[in-house]
């Protein structure tokens, strides 16, 4: 089964922000300079790549979506190189040329895949008349599904508040990659995407995930944001929205070579996915997968649809994590043809905690593929009471599907997954807790088919109920 990517070809996004040219000089290093204690690089390769807001636009078109880029440049070779490079990848450029300023350029010198130095050539565009930028935004609003404002504090977004108001008036979502500590200037945006360092520079050091959520929700309220996405490097990313439970997604990066431009990739994929008509939760899932790909590349890079598809599939031929029952049966049949052992478990998995993660990792070690069956919202309510679930089914399944230990996630409507298990007939059925094997739903069917049933222990002290009680006690205190 192929992963269903968003319909990127129908997505139109405008990117407005600080555009720049990234230059890379590569070469071997074998000696130290006699003039100073620095390495001598014998340059043998020179590359030029669009950077800043231009890299955001390239990330959008690399997915097959349509991107129009607006920014400030000089009238120079760097501007011409930018325009040519972007035209080659189908980015529609609509630059405002400023004859008194040079195009922002950053030169990096690298040897043996290590960056030795960066040299910046820039004066910034503070004080430049923003009206031509506003006119370009106004002209495009009727034909785009999202507006990205890419802020590198170089002057293109000096009038960012007016830009936000233009988009809000037209009903177009505004996504902003912020810069600096003055988030007041982004008031009214649809989504801000700070990294953890940028976030903590505004709200203070956060020692726990709970502090990130609490301070993030206050920031949303203070600045009238619709949502906040905090990218947290090896900790993944956290989506916060008023009236909804936090959505924490673990990182999907396997190796990290260079984080240059990773933020551009995240906001580019977010915008393209939203403009294609997908939900914000889905957009974050795809952006998280794309970030895991791009940090494994050197320098500012983009992600192709094939790379994104492979990333969200996680394991080459096994399909997308979240599946329908029919899709799951096909995936299981294919796994069995390859001689793989299929393990299955089930639960509510409302607020994912360390006990869940440890349990699922241990279950996965018992076979080659792990299926997690999840109670629907109605099933959870019948099982746990009217106040549950805290997290809706879609969010619970997305988070489970992002875990490395989990291959496939499927939901069921009944009080128990007996019917579902009887249809799948895993090689091994596991359940956490104090059950006896014969008490586990589906055990009779699995045994009758020659399979095994096993009870695994949960980590002591970890439970969703205890987490909820602690939150309630903290609020009272």
Swiss-Prot record:
Q: Where does the sequence pass through the membrane?
A: none
Q: What EC number(s) does this enzyme carry?
A: 2.7.1.167, 2.7.7.70
Which keywords belong to this entry? Acetylation, ATP-binding, Carbohydrate metabolism, Kinase, Multifunctional enzyme, Nucleotide-binding, Nucleotidyltransferase, Transferase
What pathway is it annotated to? Nucleotide-sugar biosynthesis; ADP-L-glycero-beta-D-manno-heptose biosynthesis; ADP-L-glycero-beta-D-manno-heptose from D-glycero-beta-D-manno-heptose 7-phosphate: step 1/4; Nucleotide-sugar biosynthesis; ADP-L-glycero-beta-D-manno-heptose biosynthesis; ADP-L-glycero-beta-D-manno-heptose from D-glycero-beta-D-manno-heptose 7-phosphate: step 3/4
Q: Name one GO cellular component term.
A: cytosol
Q: Which GO terms describe its molecular function?
A: ATP binding; heptose 7-phosphate kinase activity; heptose-1-phosphate adenylyltransferase activity; phosphotransferase activity, alcohol group as acceptor
**Region (Cytidylyltransferase): which ranges?**
344-477
Q: GO biological process: any one?
A: ADP-L-glycero-beta-D-manno-heptose biosynthetic process
UniProt: ATP binding residues: 195-198
Q: Which residues carry this modification: N6-acetyllysine?
A: 179
Task: List the catalytic activities from the record.
Answer: D-glycero-beta-D-manno-heptose 7-phosphate + ATP = D-glycero-beta-D-manno-heptose 1,7-bisphosphate + ADP + H(+); D-glycero-beta-D-manno-heptose 1-phosphate + ATP + H(+) = ADP-D-glycero-beta-D-manno-heptose + diphosphate
**What exactly does this protein do?**
Catalyzes the ADP transfer from ATP to D-glycero-beta-D-manno-heptose 1-phosphate, yielding ADP-D-glycero-beta-D-manno-heptose.
Similarity comment: family membership: In the N-terminal section; belongs to the carbohydrate kinase PfkB family. In the C-terminal section; belongs to the cytidylyltransferase family.
Q: How does it assemble?
A: Homodimer.
What is the protein's given name?
Answer: Bifunctional protein HldE
What would be the name of the gene that encodes this protein?
hldE
């Amino acid at each position: 089964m192929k992963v269903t990517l968003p319909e990127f070809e129908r997505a139109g996004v405008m990117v407005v922000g600080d555009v720049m040219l990234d230059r890379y000089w590569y070469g071997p290093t074998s000696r130290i300079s006699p003039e100073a204690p620095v390495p001598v690089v014998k340059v043998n390769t020179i590359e030029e790549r669009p950077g800043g807001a231009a890299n955001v636009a390239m990330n959008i078109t690399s997915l097959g979506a349509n991107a129009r880029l607006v920014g400030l440049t000089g009238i120079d070779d760097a501007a011409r190189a930018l325009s040519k490079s972007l035209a080659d990848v189908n980015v529609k450029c609509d630059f405002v040329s400023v004859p008194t300023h040079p195009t922002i350029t950053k030169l990096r010198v690298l040897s043996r895949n290590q960056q030795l130095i960066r040299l910046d050539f820039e004066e910034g565009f503070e004080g430049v008349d923003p009206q031509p930028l506003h006119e370009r935004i106004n002209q495009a609003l009727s034909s785009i599904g999202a507006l990205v404002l890419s802020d590198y504090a170089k002057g293109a977004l000096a009038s960012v508040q007016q830009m936000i108001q233009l988009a809000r008036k037209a009903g177009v979502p505004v996504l902003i990659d912020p810069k600096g500590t003055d988030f007041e200037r982004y008031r009214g945006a649809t989504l801000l995407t700070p990294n953890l360092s940028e976030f903590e520079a505004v709200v203070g050091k956060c020692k726990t995930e709970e502090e990130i959520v609490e301070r993030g929700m206050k920031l949303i309220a203070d600045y009238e944001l619709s949502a906040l996405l905090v990218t947290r490097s090896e900790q993944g990313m956290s989506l916060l929205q008023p009236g909804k439970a936090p959505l924490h997604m673990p990182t999907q990066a396997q190796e990290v070579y260079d984080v240059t431009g990773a933020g551009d990739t995240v906001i580019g994929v977010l915008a393209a996915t939203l403009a294609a008509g997908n939900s914000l939760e889905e957009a974050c899932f795809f952006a998280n997968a794309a970030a895991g790909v791009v940090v494994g590349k050197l320098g500012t890079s983009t992600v192709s649809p094939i790379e994104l598809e492979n990333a969200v599939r996680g394991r080459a031929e096994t399909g997308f994590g979240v599946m329908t029952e029919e899709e799951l049966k096909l995936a299981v049949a294919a796994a069995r043809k390859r001689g793989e052992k299929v393990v299955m478990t089930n639960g509510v998995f409302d607020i994912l905690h360390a006990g869940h993660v440890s349990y699922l990792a241990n279950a996965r070690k018992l076979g080659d593929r792990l299926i997690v069956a999840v109670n629907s919202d109605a099933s959870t309510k019948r099982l746990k009471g009217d106040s549950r679930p805290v997290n809706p089914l879609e969010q619970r399944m997305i988070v489970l599907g992002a875990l490395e230990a989990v291959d496939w996630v499927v939901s069921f409507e009944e009080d128990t997954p007996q019917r579902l298990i009887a249809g799948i007939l895993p090689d091994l059925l596991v359940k956490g807790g104090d059950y006896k094997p014969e008490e586990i739903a589906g055990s009779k069917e699995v045994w009758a088919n020659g399979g095994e049933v096993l009870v695994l222990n949960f980590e002591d002290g970890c439970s969703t109920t205890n987490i909820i009680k602690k939150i309630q006690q903290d609020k009272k205190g």
